[in-house]
Amino acid sequence: MSWKPLILCVDDTPSVLEGLKMLLEENGYRVLTATNGKEAVQAFTSHSVDLVLLDFHMPEMNGDMAAARMKDSKPDVPIALLSSDECLPSRDLEVVDCFIPKSKPIVSLLEKVDYLVSLRFLFRPFGALNAQAAAERVSAHQAGPESERPNGISMKKDGIQKTL
Protein backbone atom coordinates (compact mmCIF):
# COMPACT_ATOMS: atom_id res chain seq x y z
CA MET A 1 0.00 0.00 0.00
CA SER A 2 1.54 3.31 -1.08
CA TRP A 3 1.31 6.57 0.81
CA LYS A 4 -1.01 9.25 -0.61
CA PRO A 5 -0.97 12.97 0.24
CA LEU A 6 -3.89 14.30 2.31
CA ILE A 7 -5.69 17.36 0.96
CA LEU A 8 -8.12 19.41 3.04
CA CYS A 9 -10.91 20.75 0.79
CA VAL A 10 -13.08 23.53 2.17
CA ASP A 11 -16.21 24.89 0.49
CA ASP A 12 -19.67 25.83 1.76
CA THR A 13 -21.34 24.58 -1.45
CA PRO A 14 -21.93 20.81 -1.05
CA SER A 15 -21.87 20.06 -4.80
CA VAL A 16 -18.53 21.86 -5.25
CA LEU A 17 -17.07 20.10 -2.22
CA GLU A 18 -18.22 16.67 -3.43
CA GLY A 19 -16.92 17.37 -6.95
CA LEU A 20 -13.48 18.36 -5.61
CA LYS A 21 -13.40 15.29 -3.38
CA MET A 22 -14.23 12.90 -6.24
CA LEU A 23 -11.76 14.56 -8.62
CA LEU A 24 -8.89 14.43 -6.14
CA GLU A 25 -9.59 10.87 -4.99
CA GLU A 26 -9.72 9.71 -8.63
CA ASN A 27 -6.28 11.26 -9.06
CA GLY A 28 -4.64 9.48 -6.14
CA TYR A 29 -5.17 11.86 -3.23
CA ARG A 30 -6.81 11.30 0.14
CA VAL A 31 -9.35 14.02 0.95
CA LEU A 32 -10.62 15.56 4.16
CA THR A 33 -13.53 18.02 3.87
CA ALA A 34 -14.93 20.96 5.80
CA THR A 35 -17.86 23.28 5.02
CA ASN A 36 -16.70 26.51 6.65
CA GLY A 37 -13.59 28.29 7.90
CA LYS A 38 -13.97 27.31 11.54
CA GLU A 39 -14.34 23.60 10.69
CA ALA A 40 -11.37 23.92 8.35
CA VAL A 41 -9.08 25.37 11.03
CA GLN A 42 -10.08 22.57 13.44
CA ALA A 43 -9.48 19.86 10.81
CA PHE A 44 -6.18 21.46 9.80
CA THR A 45 -4.81 21.54 13.34
CA SER A 46 -5.90 17.99 14.18
CA HIS A 47 -4.69 16.24 10.99
CA SER A 48 -1.40 16.02 9.13
CA VAL A 49 -2.54 17.81 5.97
CA ASP A 50 -0.29 18.18 2.92
CA LEU A 51 -2.31 20.84 1.06
CA VAL A 52 -5.41 22.98 1.63
CA LEU A 53 -7.88 23.97 -1.10
CA LEU A 54 -9.89 26.75 0.49
CA ASP A 55 -12.94 28.61 -0.83
CA PHE A 56 -12.77 32.36 -0.26
CA HIS A 57 -16.45 33.27 0.30
CA MET A 58 -17.83 31.30 3.26
CA PRO A 59 -20.08 31.97 6.24
CA GLU A 60 -18.60 32.46 9.72
CA MET A 61 -15.00 32.91 8.50
CA ASN A 62 -13.77 33.76 4.99
CA GLY A 63 -10.96 31.79 3.42
CA ASP A 64 -8.30 34.45 3.94
CA MET A 65 -8.92 34.53 7.70
CA ALA A 66 -8.96 30.73 7.93
CA ALA A 67 -5.70 30.61 5.93
CA ALA A 68 -4.05 33.11 8.30
CA ARG A 69 -4.95 30.94 11.30
CA MET A 70 -3.70 27.82 9.55
CA LYS A 71 -0.38 29.46 8.62
CA ASP A 72 0.03 30.54 12.26
CA SER A 73 0.05 26.89 13.36
CA LYS A 74 1.66 25.13 10.36
CA PRO A 75 3.30 27.67 8.06
CA ASP A 76 4.92 25.10 5.76
CA VAL A 77 1.62 23.62 4.49
CA PRO A 78 0.66 25.15 1.12
CA ILE A 79 -2.77 26.75 0.85
CA ALA A 80 -4.58 27.46 -2.42
CA LEU A 81 -7.45 29.94 -2.26
CA LEU A 82 -10.29 29.25 -4.70
CA SER A 83 -12.99 31.72 -5.65
CA SER A 84 -15.74 32.31 -8.17
CA ASP A 85 -14.25 35.82 -8.40
CA GLU A 86 -11.67 36.18 -11.17
CA CYS A 87 -9.56 38.50 -9.05
CA LEU A 88 -9.27 39.28 -5.34
CA PRO A 89 -7.57 42.18 -3.55
CA SER A 90 -3.95 41.38 -2.76
CA ARG A 91 -4.59 41.82 0.98
CA ASP A 92 -6.87 38.76 0.77
CA LEU A 93 -4.14 36.72 -0.97
CA GLU A 94 -1.03 37.63 1.01
CA VAL A 95 -1.17 34.64 3.35
CA VAL A 96 -1.88 31.96 0.72
CA ASP A 97 0.50 30.26 -1.70
CA CYS A 98 -1.77 30.14 -4.72
CA PHE A 99 -5.00 31.70 -6.04
CA ILE A 100 -7.13 29.68 -8.46
CA PRO A 101 -10.31 31.14 -9.96
CA LYS A 102 -13.02 28.46 -10.05
CA SER A 103 -13.60 29.28 -13.73
CA LYS A 104 -10.22 27.73 -14.66
CA PRO A 105 -10.34 24.28 -16.31
CA ILE A 106 -10.13 21.21 -14.08
CA VAL A 107 -6.79 20.26 -15.62
CA SER A 108 -5.36 23.60 -14.38
CA LEU A 109 -6.56 22.83 -10.87
CA LEU A 110 -4.98 19.36 -10.95
CA GLU A 111 -1.70 20.75 -12.28
CA LYS A 112 -1.56 23.28 -9.44
CA VAL A 113 -2.45 20.63 -6.85
CA ASP A 114 0.31 18.34 -8.14
CA TYR A 115 2.77 21.25 -8.17
CA LEU A 116 1.94 22.43 -4.63
CA VAL A 117 2.09 18.91 -3.20
CA SER A 118 5.47 18.33 -4.85
CA LEU A 119 6.75 21.65 -3.47
CA ARG A 120 5.61 20.63 -0.01
CA PHE A 121 7.87 17.59 -0.09
CA LEU A 122 10.70 19.23 -1.99
CA PHE A 123 11.01 22.04 0.57
CA ARG A 124 10.13 20.02 3.67
CA PRO A 125 13.81 19.85 4.85
CA PHE A 126 13.84 23.67 4.83
CA GLY A 127 10.85 23.99 7.16
CA ALA A 128 12.37 26.74 9.32
CA LEU A 129 13.03 28.90 6.27
CA ASN A 130 9.49 28.32 4.99
CA ALA A 131 8.11 29.12 8.45
CA GLN A 132 9.91 32.46 8.38
CA ALA A 133 8.58 33.27 4.89
CA ALA A 134 5.06 32.29 5.96
CA ALA A 135 5.30 34.48 9.06
CA GLU A 136 6.28 37.38 6.80
CA ARG A 137 3.24 36.69 4.58
CA VAL A 138 0.94 36.67 7.64
CA SER A 139 2.39 40.00 8.80
CA ALA A 140 1.96 41.49 5.35
CA HIS A 141 -1.63 40.20 5.25
CA GLN A 142 -2.45 41.89 8.54
CA ALA A 143 -0.93 45.16 7.28
CA GLY A 144 -3.33 45.06 4.31
CA PRO A 145 -1.54 46.14 1.09
CA GLU A 146 -3.72 48.13 -1.30
CA SER A 147 -2.78 46.87 -4.78
CA GLU A 148 -4.79 44.36 -6.78
CA ARG A 149 -3.36 41.19 -8.33
CA PRO A 150 -3.94 40.48 -12.01
CA ASN A 151 -6.32 37.84 -13.31
CA GLY A 152 -4.98 34.31 -13.62
CA ILE A 153 -3.54 31.74 -11.31
CA SER A 154 -1.20 33.46 -8.89
CA MET A 155 1.39 31.42 -7.06
CA LYS A 156 3.73 32.57 -4.34
CA LYS A 157 6.64 30.60 -2.93
CA ASP A 158 9.12 32.09 -0.48
CA GLY A 159 8.40 35.66 -1.53
CA ILE A 160 8.46 35.04 -5.29
CA GLN A 161 5.15 35.84 -7.02
CA LYS A 162 4.19 34.25 -10.35
CA THR A 163 0.95 34.76 -12.25
CA LEU A 164 0.19 32.01 -14.72
Please state what every model-predicted region is.
Residues 35-39, 62-66:
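Acidic catalytic/metal-coordinating carboxylates
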Residues 104-117, 121-130:
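C-terminal output helix
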Residues 55:
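Active-site residues of response regulator receiver
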Residues 58:
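Receiver (REC) domain active-site loop signature in two-component systems and cognate sites
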Residues 45-47, 69-76, 94:
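Conserved phosphotransfer cores of two-component systems
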Residues 120-164:
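CheY-like receiver
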Residues 14-32:
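Two-component/phosphorelay signaling modules centered on CheY-like receiver
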